[in-house]
């Protein structure tokens, strides 16, 4: 195995171990007495793989959120383990550990692009520390320990995947990940704008002068964003409708 590949594997394993060490106690916890009872324990609509369950997942904004992919993940937990909280917490924890690895890969790609000819070892070390900070930061507790917030870690996984594929110029794969991220939770709506920022720096596909974006050279870069912005607009409308239907939007 090449040295660089071996380094990536070792860092990834270290991040997974650190994540489980930091959040492992959650595996002994029950459901959180916030929304878990209403969303999972008392909600029978998501349980099963029949047409009625899929229709409900695809059309509901239960609790104000449109999240069919998150509902499907709960359904799979229920089908294999019933309402055993261990399985639900373990799924959240595994997703967060995967996100830590994805964060490392994204950070490594960004540092490499920004640093130019910098030493690969330094790039990997910087990316590893950034990912470790993300993995064990206390702000991650809510998304990992609260089963209802599965949508955060699930959406985050595909969001980071979309970023990674975009940095590798794999636009179709990035679009697919973005779509899945929005199906888990609409919090990633602004990702197309992030892509534009990355196109300015460090990708340098667009000029910092916005007026130059209309040039022939920049046009393909902008056109490839159209499907992303269409998805953002559609899911943005759906998210607002769900929040309004749940009474979460109130006038100032």
Regions found by a protein language model. Give the residues of each.
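Polytopic membrane enzymes that build or remodel cell-surface glycoconjugates and lipids
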Residues: 1-252
